[in-house]
Amino acid sequence: GTASAMPVVERYQSAHVLEIRERLFLIDCGEGVQRQLLKNRVSLAKLDSIFITHIHGDHLFGLFPLLSTLGLSCRNTPVVIYGPSNLAPFLNFFMSYYGKGIGIEINFHPLSLKEPEVIYETKSIEVLAFPLNHKIETYGYLFREKMPQLNVRKEAVECYNLTLSEIGAIKRGDDILRPAGPDDGASFMNGFVRHSGTDEPLLIRNDEVAYRPYVPRSYAYCSDAAPSPELYTWVKGVDLLYHEATYLDEMADQAAARHHATTLQAARCALEAGAGKLVIGHYSSRC
């Protein structure tokens, strides 16, 4: 949703679903999140982890009904939650009254950070948490795909009759240098040139025979967040930046007093960070 603390008819409160490599990550969990998940046909079975930025109600109060639903759905893996350490009493209260009844296990990872730190990692993904400038302990999250391993073009394997050891070397980023020999005749095949001859070694260039299956992408979630100079560097070069923009620029004094950002400040953060695209939200009901 794009609403902030005060509920409005047209907009739901903060919650984003991010899909990476067939894994779903839920970032914040405001009221109405389950309805939006159902409306957009998001499968809870694919939910990997939940990331809470801070314990203000418009970012949190949809979590406990969602946990109940996950229990009713007979989830057989723990619900993994990351968030500020002061989220723990809320989870403990919920589990002490309802935990046995819903039959789920919660693995909570409390955060207490002064600078960015990797909090989640797989072979293909990493998530960093970093502190945000807000009235209470608040964290932003940066999701990054890792650089994928090089693949070798099928036509190159056929053209050069690559051995398994040569394929392994190419996947590590190496060039292949074959010594001169009687079998290195000059020929063309599928765009590759076999031009060595018997008197010269054959150089197989890595950049001609290898490729990466995809370009790694990144996404940063920054809410709630008043401007801070460190934030620009922490999300430097991100492909997609979500930054709260609670107020219009003419309400900058109110934004500063409440540790929020204006639309112009969100745009400036994206510009300074060199973000590819900017998405804004968390709009005040006054705007």
Spans of model-derived segments:
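Active-site metal-binding motif and surrounding structural segment of the metallo-beta-lactamase
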Residues: 31-82, 110-112
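Metal-dependent phosphodiesterase/nuclease catalytic metal-binding core
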Residues: 17, 112-280
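Short glycine-rich, flexible loops that bind phosphorylated cofactors or substrates
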Residues: 34, 59, 249-250, 287
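An N-terminally biased module of ancient metal coordination in phosphate/nucleic-acid-related enzymes
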Residues: 66, 260, 287
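Active-site neighborhood of phospho(di)ester-bond hydrolases with catalytic His/Asp-centered motifs
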Residues: 27-30, 47-55, 83-84, 219-225, ...
